[in-house]
From Swiss-Prot:
It comes from Xylella fastidiosa (strain Temecula1 / ATCC 700964). Gene3D superfamilies: 3.100.10.10. Part of the 50S ribosomal subunit. Keywords: Ribonucleoprotein, Ribosomal protein, RNA-binding, rRNA-binding. One of its GO terms (biological process) is translation. Binds to the 23S rRNA. Pfam families: Ribosomal_L27A. Residues 34-47 have a biased composition (Basic residues). The lineage of its organism: Bacteria, Pseudomonadati, Pseudomonadota, Gammaproteobacteria, Lysobacterales. GO terms for molecular function: rRNA binding; structural constituent of ribosome. Transmembrane segments: none annotated. This is Large ribosomal subunit protein uL15. The keyword Ribosomal protein applies. It comes from the Bacteria. SUPFAM superfamilies: Ribosomal proteins L15p and L18e.
Length: 147
């Protein structure tokens, strides 16, 4: 006899039939059908509690104060590490050239140079922000900033 997909079945004793609840005392799962007496878990759709619900007690997210916010300018600004500028050709750099060099993601609306590592080439940065340390390093190599 060959084995076919439509002939497959579990081995004997490997599976048992579904327990039918609420079918009399003798079954062991009669009357309350294994749900106990009253309460939300005894009801249909019971046990589906909203996240954060604490049984009527004021929930934690309402007890704690509202603080802070997430600045959109941080989300829209891409940080460019200063040593990565050395991979570019010396000269003028603007936001578009940083995007072409894939130093800035497409979601960013502006860029900021952050000091990290060393810089050897001279750059003129147009319309790009920088930290104080990065500005000092770029100006020390002979570079400049234009707004």
């Amino acid at each position: 006899m060959s084995l076919r997909l439509n002939d497959l079945k579990p081995a004997l004793g490997a599976s048992s039939s579904r327990a039918r609840v609420g079918r009399g005392i003798g079954s062991g799962l009669g009357k309350t059908a294994g749900r106990g007496h009253k309460g939300s878990f005894a009801r249909k759709g019971g046990g589906k509690i909203k996240p954060g619900f604490e049984g009527g007690q004021t929930p934690m997210q309402r007890r704690l104060p509202k603080i802070g916010f997430r600045s959109r300018s941080v989300a829209n600004t891409a940080e460019v590490l200063s040593y990565k500028l050395d991979n570019l050709e010396p000269g003028e750099i603007d936001f578009a050239s940083l995007r072409l060099a894939k130093l800035v993601p497409s979601t960013a609306k502006k860029a900021k140079i952050v000091k990290k590592g060393r810089l050897t080439k001279v750059f003129v940065l147009k319309g790009i922000e920088s930290t104080a340390g990065a500005r000092a390093m770029i100006e020390a190599t002979g570079g400049s900033f234009q707004e």
